[in-house]
């Protein structure tokens, strides 16, 4: 069921997804109280005879749609002309009211065979918990409705971005990636205490940890993928890593071929900004056949390591050569442990610029450059 945007006319057309909802048309958003009482503005009255939906089932959940079905007693079932669907984010479950400020999450649809598809990126966000309740209604000749009592409240959670959605993000990121610059090392900044802890408690090997919630809210890697964060940006005038960092004054550097080579796969993970002009692209490097590789293969678009707009590894005269995109900041996640002995740790001479940290950074949902037309 496609639901009209708030600024659409009250008599909105049916969804173009006709194979799903060809018999469904949408009415004006109604104003009624959650407890089923008649509202002064709504023209809705109670009627005991209409069946109350029960045994509600939610299925086919995506980041911005779901299917809903329920059972009803046969009594007065043939009098049902409409369904009222009350959809709320879970944190608002105790204030389920038909109010102007909640529109358009209060949905009115003509009665059609179930299950019914509810779709709308302007009110459904990915990876978000919602509550839903249903009411049956019968539209009268004078335009008023008689309604059943509300059903029980059901909870569900929307899904992450699919590969299709991530491919849309990927294509938007490609537009602004810019020309490619040569680089030779990946690096990771941390505090001295971090590297001391790695040496003492992890046998000198940096261990993957769960990615934080920075970036797109719908990214399937946030809070799930385990990896180690690296950078590869270089200064334009020197071709070397910058001396400043927001993450710590000690830097681990490792030759690029140690992490990125023909025995690894490269994946696109996310594209976002933080209310600034800077845009970030998250890439994942995973050794072929590793658990991280299997995780990414199921969820992320895979990139051609030799030919893409962000990070490449090519062979020239028998030597591996590396390039990164100039106009986006790359955040590279490596999914396996990395031993400190294969690189070097040294103190940087620049500043620790905490304001540039992306730890748990929230994506700007209004940016037209890095958002797509699904839940943010």
Curated annotation (Swiss-Prot):
Modified residues (Phosphoserine): 12, 15, 25
Regions annotated as coiled coil: none
GO cellular component: cytoplasm
Glycosylation sites: 23, 37
Signal peptide: none
Alphabetized UniProt keyword annotations: Glycoprotein, Phosphoprotein
Entry-linked InterPro entries: FN3_dom (IPR003961), FN3_sf (IPR036116), Ig-like_fold (IPR013783), PHYHIP/PHYHIPL (IPR042868), PHYIP/PHIPL_C (IPR045545)
Ranges of residues in domain Fibronectin type-III: 52-161
Keyword Phosphoprotein assigned: yes
Matching Pfam families: fn3, PHYHIP_C
Family in the record: Belongs to the PHYHIP family.
Purpose of the protein: May play a role in the development of the central system.
The protein's name in its UniProt record: Phytanoyl-CoA hydroxylase-interacting protein-like
Organism whose genome encodes this protein: Homo sapiens
């Amino acid at each position: 069921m496609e639901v009209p945007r708030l600024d659409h006319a009250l008599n909105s057309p049916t969804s173009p997804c006709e194979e799903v909802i060809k018999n469904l048309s949408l009415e004006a958003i109604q104003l009624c109280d959650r407890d089923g009482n008649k509202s002064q503005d709504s023209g809705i009255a109670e009627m005991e005879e209409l069946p109350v939906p029960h045994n509600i089932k939610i299925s086919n959940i995506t980041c911005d749609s779901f299917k809903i079905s329920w059972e009803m007693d046969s009594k007065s079932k043939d009098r049902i002309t409409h369904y009222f669907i009350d959809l709320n984010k879970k944190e608002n479950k105790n204030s389920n009211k038909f109010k102007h400020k909640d529109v358009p999450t209060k949905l009115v649809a003509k009665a059609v065979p179930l299950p019914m598809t509810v779709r709308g990126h302007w009110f459904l966000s990915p990876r978000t918990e919602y509550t839903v309740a249903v009411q049956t209604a019968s539209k009268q000749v004078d335009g008023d409705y008689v309604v059943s009592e509300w059903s029980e409240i059901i909870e569900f959670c929307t899904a992450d971005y699919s590969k299709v959605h991530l491919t849309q993000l990927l294509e938007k990121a490609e537009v602004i990636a810019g020309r490619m610059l040569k680089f030779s090392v990946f690096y990771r900044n941390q505090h001295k205490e971090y590297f001391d802890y790695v040496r003492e408690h992890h046998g000198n090997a940096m261990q993957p940890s769960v990615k934080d919630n920075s970036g797109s809210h719908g990214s399937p890697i946030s809070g799930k993928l385990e990896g180690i964060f690296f950078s590869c940006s270089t200064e334009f005038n020197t071709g070397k890593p910058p001396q400043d960092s927001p993450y710590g004054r000690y830097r681990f550097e490792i030759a690029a071929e140690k992490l990125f080579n023909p025995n690894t796969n490269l994946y696109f993970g996310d594209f976002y900004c933080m209310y600034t002009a800077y845009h970030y692209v998250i890439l994942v490097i995973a050794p072929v056949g590793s658990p991280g590789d299997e995780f990414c293969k199921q969820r992320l678009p895979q990139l051609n390591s030799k030919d893409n707009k962000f990070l490449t590894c090519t062979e020239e005269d028998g030597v591996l050569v590396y390039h990164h995109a100039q106009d986006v900041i790359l955040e590279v996640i490596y999914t396996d442990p990395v031993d400190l002995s294969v690189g070097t740790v040294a103190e940087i001479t620049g500043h620790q610029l905490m304001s540039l940290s992306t730890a748990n950074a929230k994506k700007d949902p209004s940016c037209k450059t890095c958002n797509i037309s699904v839940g943010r």
